Amino acid sequence: MGGLLIKQLSTEEDRVVVIRFGHDYNPECMKQDDILASIAEKVKNMAVIYVVDITEVPDLNSMYELYDDCPTMFFYRNKHIMVDLGTGNNNKINWALTNKQDMIDIIETVYKGARKGKGLVNSPRDFSPQYKFLKKKKKKKNKKKQKKKIKKIKKKIKNN
């Protein structure tokens, strides 16, 4: 099975090959599969999407370090394309994305970069935990500012 997959990678010349490794019964993989299935038609000119059960390709498990629940990897002309998502692991996406547009944007970035000969592309969005923390912190500050503004407006209304 692993050899067949490698052959398929080498036959695709003009599109990115997106492979979701994992188990079909895994809830994380099910989420990722739903996202991938829903965008397949939109990205058909840029990418072809495969789902691979890691129990079927044990030789690839060690080669690509497929130890996570739901890794997704990108290949172009039989070459692994890495994506800097801000998480420290550029080899693969280790979680199920919940936003269709995020996956479309990542595939488009991989496609454009790979066509230019790049082996590593930067994700259009930062998925680092630090960024998520800062974003939440900013939201809290914004809520406080909004409450202050509302109080000022209410005071102005009372005074008028």
From Swiss-Prot:
Domain of life: Eukaryota
A Pfam family per the record: DIM1
The keyword Translocase is assigned to this record: no
Main location: nucleus
Entry's Gene Ontology cellular component terms: nucleus; spliceosomal complex; U4/U6 x U5 tri-snRNP complex; U5 snRNP
Region (Disordered): 132-160
Keywords assigned by UniProt, alphabetized: mRNA processing, mRNA splicing, Nucleus, Spliceosome
Composition bias type Basic residues, residue spans: 133-160
InterPro entries: Dim1, Thioredoxin-like_sf
Similarity comment: Belongs to the DIM1 family.
Subunit structure: Component of the precatalytic spliceosome (spliceosome B complex). Component of the U5 snRNP complex. Component of the U4/U6-U5 tri-snRNP complex.
Name by which UniProt lists this protein: Thioredoxin-like protein 4A homolog
Organism: Dictyostelium discoideum
Gene (name only): txnl4a
